[in-house]
Amino acid sequence: MNTLAAIEIRPAIASALKDGLPVVALESTLISHGLPWPVNLETALAAEKAIQEQGAVPATIAVLQGKLTVGLQEPELHDLAKAEDVLKASRRDLAVAVAQGRTAATTVAATMFLAHQAGIRVMATGGIGGAHRPSANPWDISADLFELARTPVAVVCSGAKSILDIPRTLEILETLGVPVIGYGTEEFPAFYVRSSGQAVGCRIDSPEVAAKICLEHWNLGGAGLVVAQPPPVEFALERTEFEKALALAEKQAAEGNVRGPALTPYLLDRLADATCGKVLKLNRELVVENARLAAKLAKELASRQ
C-alpha cells in the first residue's frame, strides 16, 4: 500500500484539490495539547473560518482511531478538543498511531508530511518547533526543522515558539537550506513577541511575492519554506515581560524534572498562568491571522498552476 492510499482525504478536500482550488492544511496539536477547552475548539473553528473567508478550503489533519485523516469535520474537531489520551504525533509516530488504532494530533512535521502526500502546498500554525535553550536541553531539536528540509510545503507561522533558542533554530534552518521569509518584518518573530532581534533571510509584503518565492524554490528542487509574520501588535507581549515569565517557568520545569515531549506544553501552561491568560488570547489571534495569510498564499499559488 502506498502512502496516499493509507490517507483518508475527505471528499470536500479531494474535490477542491482535483479542481485546483486553494487548500490550507492545519495542524491539530494546537487543539489537543496547545490550548485548553473551550479555547482550543474556538480557535480551530476560527482558523477554518478565516481560511474560508479568503476563498480557500481548510483541511485540519489528524489521526482518528488509526486513520490518517485530511479534512476533519466539525464534530470531529469537537471530539478531539475534548478528548483525553490523545497522542502527540510527529512524523515518526504516525506508524505507531495507525498500527495501534490510536487517535493522534499531528505536529507541524507530521502535518507537513501528510499535507504533501495529499497534494496540499501550504499549512498554517502558531509557531514552528526548534532548538531548545541550553538551560533546558541543548540536544532537544524539533523534527519540524528537518521536515522543512525535506518536504515541499510552505509553513505560515509567527516564527518559532518564544521558549526556544531562536538564534540556534535559525542557524539550523540555514544549514538545512530552508528559506526564512519575514512577512511585513525584517526580524524573525518570536511567537508571543513581535521580534526576536534576529534577522530573516528576506522581507516581503504581499502574498504574490511569497507565492513567487515558493514556486522558484520548488522549481530549484527545494523543500519547505517558513513564512513568518509577527503576532498582532495589540496582543503581543513585551520582550522583558515574556523573559521574566519564561525564567520562572523554566525554573519550575527543572525542579519538576519535566523534559522531552512534555516540556513545551508544560512551559506554555506556566506562561499562561504567569501572564494571567494573556498568552491564550494571543495564541488564538495569531493562529487565525496566520490561517488568513496562508489562505491568501494558497490562492496565489493556485492561480499560478
Predicted feature residues:
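Active-site glycine-rich loop that binds ribose-phosphate moieties when present
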Residues: 105-107, 136-149, 153-174, 206-212
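General beta-strand structural signal in soluble alpha/beta enzymes
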Residues: 24-26, 59-63, 104, 122-127, ...
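Solvent-exposed alpha-helices and their adjacent loops that cap or buttress functional pockets
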Residues: 15-18, 23-24, 53, 113-117, ...
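A glycine- and small-aliphatic-rich helix-loop capping segment at beta-alpha/alpha-beta transitions
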Residues: 38-44, 76-81, 130-149, 172
